[in-house]
């Protein structure tokens, strides 16, 4: 998956999610995920997650990420609960290393983990009857400063 220079996200159509089954992806952050955008460097980019009807800025859960000056990728639980935005740093991962990211909705909680890294978080967001897959998004307010490639394979 490539986010092109000057954009926030690749072109994609919304995908509905049926049931409460886990989302699993093998994710590899490539060296192109290193970037410098000045004062907005602390903004959190989005990787994948679940948005609930009517809008993901009401209730949603996503893995977030940003490049760290220590040459790692900071990973976040990034979510909206009843229209209020929250985020919590849950760990760091290296570049050019495949990781399995899992999001498991269950009742009013979503468990987020990265296998083999000891990274784990529980996010309290209530689901609605209708849900849709949220894909990669660069930003905050800034667009991608160059092509950003993240290798993503749904498992």
What are these regions (language model features)?
Residues 1-75:
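Secretory/extracellular carbohydrate-interaction modules
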Residues 71-75, 108-112, 119:
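Hydrophobic residues embedded in beta-strands of well-ordered beta-sheets
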Residues 83, 107, 116-118, 140:
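Residue-level detection of beta-strand-connecting loop/turn positions
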Residues 18, 68, 92-96, 127, ...:
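Surface-exposed coil/turn segments at beta-strand junctions on protein surfaces, enriched
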Residues 25, 97-106, 110-114:
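Short tryptophan-centered beta-strand motifs in secreted/extracellular beta-sheet-rich domains
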Residues 84-89, 117-123:
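Surface-exposed loop/edge segments in extracytoplasmic proteins
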Residues 122-155:
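Flexible glycan-contacting loops in extracellular carbohydrate-active proteins
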Residues 75-100:
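Short, aromatic/His-centered strand-loop micro-motif at the edge of beta-sheets
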């Amino acid at each position: 998956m490539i986010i092109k220079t000057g954009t926030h996200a690749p072109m994609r159509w919304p995908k509905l999610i049926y049931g409460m089954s886990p989302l699993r992806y093998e994710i590899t952050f490539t060296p192109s995920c290193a970037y410098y955008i000045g004062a907005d460097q602390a903004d959190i980019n989005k990787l994948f997650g679940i948005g609930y009807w009517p809008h993901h800025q009401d209730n949603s859960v996503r893995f977030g990420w940003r490049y760290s000056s220590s040459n790692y990728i900071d990973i976040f639980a990034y979510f909206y609960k009843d229209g209020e935005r929250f985020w919590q740093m849950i760990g760091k991962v290296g570049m050019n290393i495949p990781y399995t990211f899992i999001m498991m909705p269950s009742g009013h909680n979503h468990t987020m983990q990265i296998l083999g890294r000891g990274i784990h978080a529980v996010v309290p967001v209530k689901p609605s009857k209708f849900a849709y897959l949220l894909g990669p998004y660069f930003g905050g307010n800034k667009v991608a400063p160059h092509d950003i490639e993240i290798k993503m394979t749904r498992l």
